[in-house]
Regions:
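Intrinsically disordered, low-complexity acidic/polar segments
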Residues: 23, 36, 101, 163-165, ...
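Radical SAM/AdoMet-radical enzyme domain recognition
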Residues: 43-62, 71-174, 182
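Auxiliary Fe-S-binding modules of radical SAM enzymes
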Residues: 1-11, 172, 176, 187-192
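Ligand-binding loop in jelly-roll beta-barrel domains
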Residues: 179
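A short acidic, helix-capping loop that chelates divalent metal ions and anchors anionic groups
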Residues: 32-36, 122-129, 190-192
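Conserved G/P- and acidic residue-centered "switch" motifs that form tight phosphate/ATP-binding loops
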Residues: 67
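Canonical Radical SAM [4Fe-4S] cluster-binding loop centered on the CxxxCxxC motif
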Residues: 4-44, 55-56
Length: 192
């Protein structure tokens, strides 16, 4: 399968929920409508779609949300994706709040890597950005993933007047720990 520019498409992103346990102001501001339960695909539907895409040459699937770890049984989806012929890699984008407690099941299911959203190393600023006091849980999730050998990539979204000075501190983590840091452009959701 190829895109309109002739590039081979090998990557599928599955957004398994619109729910999140954080309220980052650039992603989940107040007033963003939630989907009705019947508007969200079941895991069986996701697996059927992934199998169809695999037959067209997709070999990598990224599980995202919202926050995918808030959806019950997400490790079963990972396991099912890994069982699809042609799917070589299953990754997840997460805020890592629930990663420490769910890491054993995800590791057993075959999760290949995680991208973790982290915009600051300052707990007070983290609480301001996310409207939640979960910095310690995120740090524990990062440590748990690294400890179990799951490759980690940190995604940092710099915001003018908020955390633009954090990029260097986050980048320094890559010198101390076996992880990568990626700075990504802010893409506001729900603003028209």
């Amino acid at each position: 399968m190829f895109d309109s520019k002739g590039r081979k498409i090998h990557y599928l992103r599955l957004s398994v929920t619109d729910l999140c346990n954080l309220r980052c102001r650039y992603c989940m501001p107040d007033g963003v409508d939630k989907l009705e339960r019947e508007d969200i695909l079941t895991y069986e539907e996701f697996l059927r779609l992934a199998a169809l895409f695999a037959r067209c040459g997709v070999d990598t699937v990224r599980v995202t949300g919202g926050e995918p770890l808030v959806r019950k049984g997400v490790e079963q989806l990972v396991k099912g994706l890994k069982a699809i012929p042609g799917i070589r890699k299953v990754t997840m984008t997460t805020n890592a709040v629930l990663l420490e407690q769910q890491r054993p099941a995800l590791r057993e299911a075959g999760l290949d890597s995680v991208n973790i959203s982290l915009d600051t190393l300052d707990p007070a600023l983290f609480a301001k950005i996310t409207a939640r006091d979960e910095f310690a849980a995120v740090q524990a999730g990062i440590h748990a993933a690294l400890e179990s050998g799951i490759p980690v990539k940190l995604n940092c979204v710099p915001q003018v007047g908020v955390n633009e000075g954090e990029r260097e501190a986050l980048a320094a983590l890559a010198q101390d720990k076996p992880l990568q840091v990626r700075v990504i452009e802010m893409m506001p959701i729900g603003y028209g």
